Amino acid sequence: MASKAFILIETAVGKTREVASTLKSVEGMQSVEVVTGPYDVIAVIDAPDINTMGTLVTEKIHTLSGVVRTVTCVAVGA
């Protein structure tokens, strides 16, 4: 079952645009936006299942230089 999530990302000072640019090339990213507020970037990801989503977040997002913290909000329906 396909899974969708919103990833709220806090970046290191001066790294926001670099992180956003790198995220756009990661497979599974539906959209990446630089935003204002307590988070610097919001990414929307699609994955075939929750395990793949977890791997994407922990291995592709958490490991990026400039990423300080993330919050993953899994979509549960409308």
What spans do the regions from the language model cover?
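A compositional/biophysical signature of low hydrophobicity enriched in polar/charged and small residues
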Residues: 1-78
